[in-house]
């Protein structure tokens, strides 16, 4: 066999994904253990991975972009318990706040401008708005 006749095969052990989540969850005890499903679950397919994590008790999920949040919400729409979807790279375009609020997406705010926009939106509608804030100050 030469290099031109070889190919790669990737086998994904879905039971190992479930087992790894259970193990990580056991390490954090009563803290939240979230699943990170960005980039279509790192190429494994959000429609296959999200239900596995959900069935293991995962209710908090991080995605990279809003379109991934929509896809995740659709995949898990038939499940009974509420899920929390955190979006790492929000669009931050005019009107994004209404969209996130309507779909119950939780933004990960990466700069003070986004923090102020989200805070102002909450004041406008008289609600406290959930968010994760990651600010790196130099």
Whereabouts are the PLM-identified features?
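Nucleotide phosphate-binding/pyrophosphate-handling subdomain across enzymes
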Residues: 16-33
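Active-site-proximal beta-alpha core segment in soluble small-molecule metabolic enzymes
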Residues: 4, 9-12, 29-138
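Short, basic/glycine-rich phosphate-binding loops at helix/coil junctions
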Residues: 1
